[in-house]
């Protein structure tokens, strides 16, 4: 009898686990749909889409825009800053007005999650709609984020030329692609409906990205973590960074980053929903979903500033697919095996003729 019961449990357990994951996947899709509704409500009210990063990104108290910096460690309470995420912009349209009212946009945006942060009360919050229930890497939940807006598109660029020219937002990389990115959302200058000749239904707006593993620096990185690009340069071409990180083999390094999208326990810094950057709320379509390569930064493994470019791919723990929110509000499951050219084209506002044929919708 015991053996029979054990066999029945063995048969039923996978079915139960599958049903639970199916429910989590549906909830993940619903979260993205809610984000999509908020984005469209924002556009209807403002006549443009949310900015993933405001200008100036970093200026001193006199208003002088800083050109050179590699992180926000030196930001003081009196600085002028603009690295507020698209997530922050849509909060009022997600019935989160209470949190919005707590954010002091006229004071410096700070990533250190202590009482000295101007917005600590607002950011010391968990927003369930920003958390994928299947994401096993979620930690304390507070300020954490599983969903990212598509800024880079088919480029690895973050919105500025490099970490020494953070105030240069126009121009092209060595591959001719715009340093402002070609995704649905553009740092510093908002996109509008007229900027989508391919149509909203053919352009990815948001997707999911597994949070960092939260491991210690003495451990190997997982696919959820970021590394510094081997042979890094300040402004790599798309294929250069893709090839450099495609064949990477995990190694212990102080330059690995384990806290993407997270506020790890014991850490005073958050990389969650309030903040701009590839370390927190932005992604691109340079690499396919759940790719076998390693996400990486070209100048730093913590690509939080606009001049720190990166491959930040869509990733999930749903199996062999990711959920993608398109500009018309539709949410589609995209398989890992999607053709890379198609995936990159779906990440752009205006693909070349024929690029979006054979797509996923």
Question: Language-model segments: what does each one mean?
Answer:
Residues 18-361:
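Internal low-complexity, small-residue/proline-rich segments
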